[in-house]
């Protein structure tokens, strides 16, 4: 763990930011896939304004497919909420002492969600054709990005519940993140 990492507050990031939320969303049927990657290679891909967040010296890249449910702006009635499939490719960064997520790519099965996220949040969203099959015990998830042919296909079975993540554990490092960071062109 780096000297800078010691000063990162890994407990209070779970507290809600001040002010009203921009909207509502629920994530369901998540799968977290992660790989350790060389820090030097990852550093070249992440903007310099972000510090790589390392778990005991190791950098991680993750692929996270899931179902996004009940997505709507704060003032919109629940009846307007959208549900769609999404996959994100991410790594973990720190900005001003706050641990968060940096997305390399996000795919969504909703063209509207892609357009709004790109415009309002400068996130690298892409439209994709996606399919989710199976039940709560076994799931197949497929995604093909529109216009590029990029394909993601995974089949997984649910194992035993892990329980709450423990501070300092890899699970806590990867999952207990409540901030996302991006850069807008020109800032």
Over which residues does each language-model region extend?
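N-terminal intrinsically disordered, cationic/polar leader segments
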Residues: 2-9, 68-76, 98, 125, ...
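Hydrophobic, proline/glycine-rich low-complexity stretches
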Residues: 2-74
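Short, surface-exposed, charge-dense and proline/glycine-enriched linear segments
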Residues: 6-11, 78-92, 132-137
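Active-site-adjacent core segments of small-molecule enzymes
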Residues: 12-18, 76-79, 83, 114-117, ...
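Intrinsically disordered, low-complexity segments enriched in polar/charged residues with Gly/Pro
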Residues: 19, 39, 77-80, 165-168
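A generic structural signal for short, solvent-exposed coil/turn residues
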Residues: 24-25, 44, 55, 83, ...
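Extended, compositionally biased
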Residues: 59-108
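Internal, well-folded beta-alpha domain core
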Residues: 88-187
């Amino acid at each position: 763990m780096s000297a800078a990492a010691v000063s990162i507050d890994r407990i209070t990031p779970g507290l809600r930011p001040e002010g009203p939320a921009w909207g509502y969303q629920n994530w369901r049927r998540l799968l977290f896939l992660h790989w350790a990657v060389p820090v030097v290679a990852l550093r070249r891909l992440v903007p310099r304004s972000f510090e790589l967040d390392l778990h005991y010296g190791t950098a991680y890249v993750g692929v996270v497919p899931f179902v996004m449910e009940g997505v709507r702006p704060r003032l919109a009635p629940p009846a307007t909420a959208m549900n769609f499939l999404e996959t994100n490719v991410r790594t973990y960064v720190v900005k001003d002492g706050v641990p968060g997520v940096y997305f390399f790519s996000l795919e969504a099965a909703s063209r509207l969600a892609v357009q709004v996220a790109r415009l309002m949040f400068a996130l690298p969203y892409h439209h994709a054709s996606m399919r989710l099959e199976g039940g709560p015990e076994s799931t197949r998830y497929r995604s093909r990005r529109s216009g590029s042919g990029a394909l993601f296909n995974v089949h997984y079975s649910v194992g035993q519940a892990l329980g709450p993540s423990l501070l300092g554990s890899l699970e806590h490092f990867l999952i207990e993140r409540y901030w996302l960071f991006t850069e807008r062109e020109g800032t």
